[in-house]
A protein has these predicted regions:
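Conserved helix/coil segment N-terminal to the catalytic DExD/H
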Residues: 272-289, 293-310
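Interdomain helical connector at the RecA1-RecA2 junction of SF1/SF2 helicase-like NTPases
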Residues: 348, 361-364
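Conserved RecA-like helicase motor-core motifs
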Residues: 27-32, 233-248, 261-263
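ATP-dependent helicase/translocase motor core
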Residues: 18, 25-27, 39-42, 84-190, ...
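Catalytic centers of nucleases
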Residues: 7-98, 113
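SF2 helicase catalytic motif II
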Residues: 306-350
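Catalytic P-loop NTPase motifs of RecA-like helicase/translocase cores
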Residues: 72, 220, 321-325, 358-359
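Conserved Walker A/P-loop ATP-binding site and its immediately adjacent core
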Residues: 208-231, 238-249, 296
Length: 364
């Protein structure tokens, strides 16, 4: 029975602990402070900045707001205004102004009003949302958490491949011995994404570059979450989305960059900068995972042309979309570009789907 400010303080520490424990976030952030602990708070009041997180190995800081609400509550513009203003201003390290590299709003509700949605879109520095549905999936063993002792929090246990997945893994690896392109066809719900990760681990042996292409941001989030939770090697994660809204197929909602579960990059130069910085300081073996929407494939292509980096394997999810058969008027060209090795340099390509497209002879 805590009062509201005690609840708020508990929730901030709860989120801080998630950032330091979750396999997704602890690989990205090397330190997380409450505002009171933040060494550069300048003795100022928090004005809505509840936590500050420092990116691993880089002098980049993220401002975080933690919103502890009923799950039916809708986050409003008024709820985020103060935070947006405060985090738009610099803080000082040894008298030198430093701007936040990005901003994150964590909430225990999935609901946002239209005005609140509109206000966080296209902000500089960018705003990312982590909502209740995302928190549930960040790789925490929720049964381990004791409300009065947050240090009890543990990572969720990793899975082991099921017999049908073992068969799929060995068949794909066998195929790749003689050819550089293959298909992985598995029914929905049988663990395609997980199976693909185990294929990637076997190919890279913990050291390499992997591109995973998806048609939507929600699939990008799902895949990224699953892969970093289940990966048995050290990894670095890069999320790439296009600047414009990533639209999905008809009848589905338009998604936005604010919904990527880790901060996403929208341009090739920024991606090169991020990759090069980490490449220069990291001497340990890692798998570098690049998660991208098909709509942003241009960014990946430019990035490769600048760095000369080649992917060891590229995974095309929902691969039936890459056949070039389009709905009337739909722009599917981004989906087809992945086949072209002069556009995306990759030693191997794996096309994944639950629904392969089959053509009658006359349509070939």
């Amino acid at each position: 029975d805590k009062n509201t400010s005690e609840q708020g303080a508990w929730f901030e520490n709860f989120i801080k602990r998630i950032f330091l424990t979750s396999p997704i976030y602890k690989e990205i952030y090397e330190n997380v402070w409450t505002w009171a602990e933040f060494p550069y708070n300048g003795g100022r009041h928090d004005y809505g900045i509840d936590l500050v997180a420092k990116i691993k190995d880089l002098e980049e800081y993220y401002a975080i707001q933690c919103k502890f609400y009923e799950d039916e509550y809708s986050v409003s513009k008024r709820d985020v205004d103060t935070f947006l203003t405060a985090s738009g201003k610099p803080f000082y390290i040894d008298g030198i102004p430093v701007r936040y590299a990005g901003r994150i709003i964590v909430s225990t509700t999935d609901k946002w009003t239209k005005t609140a949605n509109d206000i966080i879109e296209g902000q500089i520095p960018a705003v990312t949302r982590i909502r209740l549905k995302d928190l549930k999936e960040v790789g925490i063993d929720w049964n381990s958490v004791l409300v009065n002792d947050l240090s009890s929090m543990k990572k969720a246990q990793k899975k082991v491949p099921l017999p049908h997945q073992e068969v799929a893994i060995s068949k794909v690896l066998e195929g790749f011995r003689t050819v550089d392109r293959g298909k992985l066809i598995m029914a929905c719900g049988t663990g395609k994404t997980y199976t693909a990760l185990k294929v990637v681990e076997a190919i890279t042996k913990g050291d390499g570059n992997v591109l995973f292409l998806v048609p939507s941001i929600s699939l990008l989030n799902q895949t990224l979450l699953e892969w970093v939770k289940e990966c048995n090697y050290d990894y670095q994660v890069y999320a790439v989305c296009s600047d414009s809204k990533v639209t999905k197929s008809r009848n589905e909602s338009i998604e936005d960059l604010t919904d990527t579960i880790v901060p996403a990059t929208t341009d090739a130069e920024r991606l090169v900068e991020e990759y090069t910085k980490l490449w220069n300081i990291s001497d340990k073996k890692v798998i570098r995972f690049f998660f991208s929407t098909y709509q942003s494939i241009e960014v990946i292509s430019k990035f490769q042309k600048i760095t000369g980096m080649e992917f060891d394997v590229t995974i095309c999810d929902e691969a039936h979309r890459t056949t070039g058969v389009t709905l009337a008027g739909a722009d599917e060209s981004n989906f087809v570009k992945v086949h072209d090795n002069s556009f995306i340099f990759s030693k191997k390509r794996l096309y994944m789907t639950a629904t392969p497209r089959i053509y009658a002879d006359e349509s070939k």
